């Protein structure tokens, strides 16, 4: 679908008004922005957003026999060991496919004969 909207159309439609932004936390992976806003109903408030700084890529490797290869590791935020698909963050300028190839090789030692994009989402 082609986007024929003028460059400023979102500004005209946005019912939120931002009166200030601060960054209470930032590291190599994410930034937290805290915005002072006026809600669409006119009430003031604070709206905080976590912005992911790097493209994240996951690979679900399925071999010729139908086996799925997962990697296991201790996840500090979960407080437990977790089995998961090979995944990681792209280096600056690295595209998703190159990142997927690199992460698969780094985490499993495997190389895929083919890749199929299944999902892309904004977090």
Spans of features found by a protein language model:
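Acidic, metal-coordinating catalytic segment for phosphate/diphosphate chemistry
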Residues: 20-58, 63-64
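A short coil-to-beta-strand element that immediately follows conserved catalytic motifs
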Residues: 17, 111-118
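Short helix-to-loop capping/linker segments positioned immediately adjacent to catalytic or ligand/cofactor-binding
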Residues: 107, 118-123
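Acidic pyrophosphate-coordinating catalytic loop
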Residues: 23-27, 76, 121-123
């Amino acid at each position: 679908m082609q986007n024929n909207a003028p460059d400023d159309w979102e500004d005209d439609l946005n019912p939120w008004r931002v009166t200030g932004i601060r960054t209470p936390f930032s590291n190599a992976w994410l930034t937290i922005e805290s915005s002072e806003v006026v809600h669409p109903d006119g009430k003031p408030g604070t709206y905080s957003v976590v912005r992911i700084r790097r493209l994240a890529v996951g690979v679900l490797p399925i071999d010729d026999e139908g086996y799925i290869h997962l990697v296991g590791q201790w996840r500090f935020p979960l407080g437990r060991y977790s089995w998961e698909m090979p995944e990681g963050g792209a280096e600056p300028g690295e595209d998703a496919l190159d990142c997927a190839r690199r992460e698969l090789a780094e985490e499993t030692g495997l190389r895929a004969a083919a890749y199929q994009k299944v999902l892309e989402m904004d977090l």
